Amino acid sequence: MSLNVIALGGNAILDTDPTDEGQKAVVNHAAKYIAEFVAKGEQVIVCHGNGPQVGNLLLQQKAGESEKNPALKLDTCVAMTQGSIGYWLQNALTNEFEKRNIAKPVISVVTQVRVDKEDPSFKKPSKPIGPFYTKEEADAEAAKDGSTYVEDAGRGYRKVVPSPMPKEIVEKEAVRALVEADVLTICSGGGGIPVVAEDGQYVGVEAVNDKDFSARVLAENVDADRLIILTGVDNIYINYNQPDQKALEQISVAEAEEYIKEGHFAAGSMLPKIEAALDFVKGDDKRKAIITSIENLENIDKEAGTVISQKG
């Protein structure tokens, strides 16, 4: 039995239908594959992103702001999306386990992630959140509140916020205890609520952590065997969308680093996933990181997807 940390993207959850029902339907679809994976005897911790959701929630907060109903800060919005998406996943997985007669409890944990208050991202926001805009729409939004908008992997323009590098999962001991009790745990949602340590206390900061880097830290903190990062394609590609594109199957740390140097991976898209995978497997021959689609999860034991390991 392997311990697997599975990272599910927020963009995958909010695909085309931003309604409550639409996002639940996507989560229900993902839960079927995760349940089948668990049915094979695998231990699983589920993390999820929240980029579109937290951005939309922040817009709702700003739109409804008044003296008696002030907008909540970004770290609180991250916590709120942990609750909503965690509920959807918890409900969907519980239902799928019931269908399969799997006697495994499911729980969502509100998770704080310690970051460095001196992290350079606080001065240079880089994490895209919220909806996509045209260039004209983004310029108009930026003029309203001075926020920064950047192009996101050719899909349009999005607001960017600080995204400090995760250092530690504050609730890691609780997560370990739940795993040892054979509880499927949903945690570190949206990359975790970013907090800094000040005078022996944890204090929330306005930022959104990258869920793949947080999943990597979580996988290290609980000594997971595999980090599985789910995305919209079955494999990583080099020369993506070119006539000579090539799917990568099993690659070493050295090979992945060379592909990064050659500029094959977009900074706001596949690059952070690969960097998180590399950080997890470096220096440990037993660990594997796998990047693939949710539909390919059932084939992972057959070396499906892109498998990154120390030696390839």
From Swiss-Prot:
It is an enzyme of class 2 (transferase). Keywords: Arginine metabolism, ATP-binding, Cytoplasm, Kinase, Nucleotide-binding, Transferase. Belongs to the carbamate kinase family. Pathway: Metabolic intermediate metabolism; carbamoyl phosphate degradation; CO(2) and NH(3) from carbamoyl phosphate: step 1/1. GO terms for molecular function: ATP binding; carbamate kinase activity. It is found in: Cytoplasm. Its main location: cytoplasm. The lineage of its organism: Bacteria, Bacillati, Bacillota, Bacilli, Lactobacillales. Its EC number is 2.7.2.2. It catalyses: hydrogencarbonate + NH4(+) + ATP = carbamoyl phosphate + ADP + H2O + H(+). One of its GO terms (biological process) is arginine deiminase pathway. CDD domains: AAK_CK. This is Carbamate kinase 2. InterPro entries: AceGlu_kinase-like_sf (IPR036393), Asp/Glu/Uridylate_kinase (IPR001048), Carb_kinase (IPR003964). SUPFAM superfamilies: Carbamate kinase-like. GO terms for cellular component: cytosol. It holds the Pfam family AA_kinase.
